[in-house]
């Protein structure tokens, strides 16, 4: 893991037969490094795959200088067919800053609101303005100079960053449509044949984990690095 990494977050997507997760490292100026993209397969109605996910989230990652870091914050999507199980899993791990999220579309929806416990499990649930977050992810992907907000990805496929990953990461684009006589911006798939977009969503969730936890030491004094809006 590169020495510039100071803080690790994780984004987790829940599918019917697997979890997909990405560990992202963050440095000064919110420069980021893709650390690992992982698929964890199993029957989500049984406990083993949840235990496997917990093991993955408990992994420590070693930097080149020997320093070990653990995942300090994670956001897990509660959409799909297992919302109660996701919220319960996260509730039991809130002390590890593992949070359940629920996406809400719309360009005017704030990226993050304060969590609620208005659910059957009584666990914290963050409503995530996913379109706002996608704007931030895309803005960072467009940064071409290494430094603040730049995104690094490892060479080779050993860490899960294969051709399919980058197809998913870039599967969507922002378009403008007319609705009711006014312009409306929305995110759509570029190619209907490329329907998988989990990598884009998961990088969004890992970014949300960073913003919710708001760790010190990543900002550059006097420089505005904010690409997103956090609602109180």
Across the structure, where does each feature detected by a protein language model lie?
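C-terminal nuclease/phosphodiesterase catalytic domains that cleave nucleic-acid phosphodiester bonds
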Residues: 79-227
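Nucleic-acid-processing active sites and adjacent nucleic-acid-binding tracks
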Residues: 1, 5, 16-73
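Short hydrophobic beta-strand that contains or immediately precedes a catalytic carboxylate
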Residues: 9-12
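Conserved small/polar residues in nucleotide/adenosyl-binding loops
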Residues: 228-232
């Amino acid at each position: 893991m590169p020495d510039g990494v100071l803080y690790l977050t994780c984004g987790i997507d829940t599918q019917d037969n697997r979890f997909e997760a990405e560990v992202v490292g963050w440095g000064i100026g919110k420069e980021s490094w893709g650390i690992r993209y992982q698929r964890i397969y199993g029957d989500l109605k049984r406990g083993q795959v949840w235990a496997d996910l917990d093991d993955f989230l408990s992994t420590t990652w070693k930097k080149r200088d020997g320093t070990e870091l653990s995942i300090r914050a994670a956001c897990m999507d509660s959409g799909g067919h297992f919302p109660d199980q996701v919220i319960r899993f996260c509730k039991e791990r809130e002390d590890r800053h593992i949070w359940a999220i629920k996406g809400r579309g719309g360009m005017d929806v704030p990226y993050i609101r304060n969590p609620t416990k208005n659910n059957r499990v009584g666990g914290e649930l963050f409503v995530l303005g996913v379109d706002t977050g996608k704007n931030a992810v895309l803005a960072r992907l467009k940064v071409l100079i290494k430094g603040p907000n730049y995104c690094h990805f490892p060479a080779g496929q050993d860490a899960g960053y294969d051709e399919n990953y980058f197809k998913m990461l870039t599967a969507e684009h922002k378009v403008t449509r007319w609705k009711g006589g006014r312009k409306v911006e929305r995110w759509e798939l570029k190619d209907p044949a490329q329907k998988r977009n989990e990598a884009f969503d998961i990088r969004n969730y890992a970014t949300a984990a960073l913003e919710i936890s708001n760790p010190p030491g990543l900002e550059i004094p006097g420089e505005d690095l904010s690409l997103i809006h956090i609602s109180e």
